Amino acid sequence: MTDTRNGEDSGKLLYCSFCGKSQHEVRKLIAGPSVFICDECVDLCNDIIREEVQEAQAESSAHKLPSPKEISGILDQYVIGQERAKKVLAVAVYNHYKRLNQRDKKGDEVELGKSNILLIGPTGSGKTLLAETLARLLNVPFTIADATTLTEAGYVGEDVENIIQKLLQKCDYDVEKAQMGIVYIDEIDKISRKSDNPSITRDVSGEGVQQALLKLIEGTVASVPPQGGRKHPQQEFLQVDTRNILFICGGAFSGLEKVIQNRSTKGGIGFGAEVRSKEEGKKVGESLREVEPDDLVKFGLIPEFVGRLPVLATLDELDEAALMQILTEPKNALTKQYAKLFEMESVDLEFRSDALKAVARKALERKTGARGLRSILEGVLLDTMYEIPSKKEVSKVVIDESVIEGTSQPLMIYENSEPQAKAAPDA
């Protein structure tokens, strides 16, 4: 087939000006001013240009990759405390993407391995937020998977390949981009073995899922249906290489501190045994810092799975001071978010310091960490947010400790008038 200008066809045999093939040897011959180029040469030129562009992009991304100190500094803007975890994550992520930038260099005999990460910490301590912030900072595709929904292939539930499908959806099914992404698998502690003893029944949502995740996390070519379709034999699959995807697994691992304490303290029975009170015991965060791979195996993770997660980072339980900082200091702090909502109604929102302390105390009592702060503030501000759009004359709302405790309503300050506050209704 030949393309010529103005439909002209001289009737004589035409040849590609670059490779010399005739019009009968190629699928398409494109005409220019006194020259011709075939489809094969066009493809070759495209490949050359694509390689040069990719090399340039790799070099520029290598220059743009922030140092571990810079990564940790950016994490500080969004996540309060957890300095040790930030340092571990910053170094691991920096080394991971440095490894990706070096992988295509020729003549380098040393092959760098991948270091996936395991985050251990109480609920609401910032595990998911750390992973989300890292992905946003590095501008790479990011997805969160819930380990509790995963089952072995062939059983009711999600296959592990669905994790890669979610990652592809985040980057419009661009396989190259997906292969540089970050996957955060939450609630990883929930797929621990149900028992140390072998059972005649198959553990399809525990050890079975760990086995299924092994190759995916270590690095394999996963077959994923295009555009979220269901698998069937006649379908063409997208092939995604997971060797360069960074997997971050996180979980609360409730009870792991007891496993660690049993290992690290001398046990004894009888009259000579040392009696230790609860007060003498360490805090959960302090115990978790001493975690070793054997402790995770005793908890219920299989040794092969623990081996695929060489980087361990533990997060501390948040105290009252840290929760107060979370309410006010980060870029997207909750008090700033609610102040923005009220600002849209031309109303100033003020939280007194005693109110912030009361919110932090309530969150500690509920044992929900930073995650519980929003639900407390939502409950406190519900009535006010309901009324404010209808009261155009309100200029400021003040929240103090009594409002958080439920003994009074927020103080509303009206334009050109005295402040008004309603007593809380009797329970």
UniProtKB/Swiss-Prot annotation:
The segment(s) forming the ClpX-type ZB domain are 4-57
Pfam families, alphabetized: AAA_2, ClpB_D2-small, zf-C4_ClpX
Q: Which residues bind Zn(2+)?
A: 16, 19, 38, 41
User: Any keyword Transferase?
Assistant: no
Extract the InterPro entries matched here.
Answer: AAA+_ATPase, ATP-dep_Clp_protease_ClpX, ATPase_AAA_core, Clp_ATPase_C, Clp_protease_ATP-bd_su_ClpX, ClpX_bact, P-loop_NTPase, Znf_CppX_C4
Which amino acids does the record list as binding ATP? Answer: 122-129
* SUPFAM superfamilies in UniProt: Glucocorticoid receptor-like (DNA-binding domain), P-loop containing nucleoside triphosphate hydrolases
UniProt keyword annotation of Zinc present = yes
Q: What GO terms fall under cellular component here?
A: HslUV protease complex
| SMART domains linked to this entry | AAA (SM00382), ClpB_D2-small (SM01086), zf-C4_ClpX (SM00994)
Superkingdom in the source lineage: Bacteria
Q: Which UniProt keywords apply?
A: ATP-binding, Chaperone, Metal-binding, Nucleotide-binding, Zinc
Described purpose of this protein according to its UniProt entry = ATP-dependent specificity component of the Clp protease. It directs the protease to specific substrates. Can perform chaperone functions in the absence of ClpP.
Query: Which HAMAP family does the annotation name?
Result: ClpX (MF_00175)
UniProt record similarity statement: Belongs to the ClpX chaperone family.
Protein name according to UniProt = ATP-dependent Clp protease ATP-binding subunit ClpX
User: Lineage from the top down?
Assistant: Bacteria, Pseudomonadati, Pseudomonadota, Gammaproteobacteria, Pseudomonadales
